[in-house]
Amino acid sequence: MSDDDSRASTSSSSSSSSNQQTEKETNTPKKKESKVSMSKNSKLLSTSAKRIQKELADITLDPPPNCSAGPKGDNIYEWRSTILGPPGSVYEGGVFFLDITFTPEYPFKPPKVTFRTRIYHCNINSQGVICLDILKDNWSPALTISKVLLSICSLLTDCNPADPLVGSIATQYMTNRAEHDRMARQWTKRYAT
């Protein structure tokens, strides 16, 4: 290698290393910030993933009556649940599918639970959104997905017309119970069997 080549190589490597050093210096604060937020997110993911894994083991060993639930695929945060219409209710004989989505903040924030099967119910709208206090303001980290599913089953047995999501169905429930029950059975037969 000639002296000129050697100088050019040294000069380019020193300018390259000074450019890298300048880039490192300007990027250092950003890396620290992202490490802090990544660390916080990792802890949340770790906490929520551990909790969800434990609940999956529990619900697999001891599922609530007439219910099942578990991950849709490899994503522990996306579950599918099945609820059988409670015996003696207008939903008896129906098989209802629900989606359960956990956030990284779980169990400190409630899971999002929605019906995928259409249902005629004053506390469940046409998008499958459920009006249930424990899925909103009355959520507690002490609650589990098994308890949530039991509460939903209870809602299928005894709706809450005092806090409706679908006002017309709640009014019908209170003023013309026979017609309400007929419609609920009809929808169950049409959409859930």
From Swiss-Prot:
Primary location group: nucleus
Top-level lineage group: Eukaryota
Subcellular location: Nucleus
Polar residues: compositionally biased ranges: 36-45
Active-site residues, as the UniProt record annotates them: 131 (glycyl thioester intermediate)
Top-level class of the enzyme under EC nomenclature: transferase
GO biological process: ISG15-protein conjugation; positive regulation of transcription by RNA polymerase II; protein K48-linked ubiquitination; protein monoubiquitination; protein polyubiquitination; protein ubiquitination; ubiquitin-dependent protein catabolic process
Any GO molecular function: ATP binding
Subunit: Interacts with RNF14.
Protein name: Ubiquitin-conjugating enzyme E2 E1
Species this chain originates from: Homo sapiens (Human)
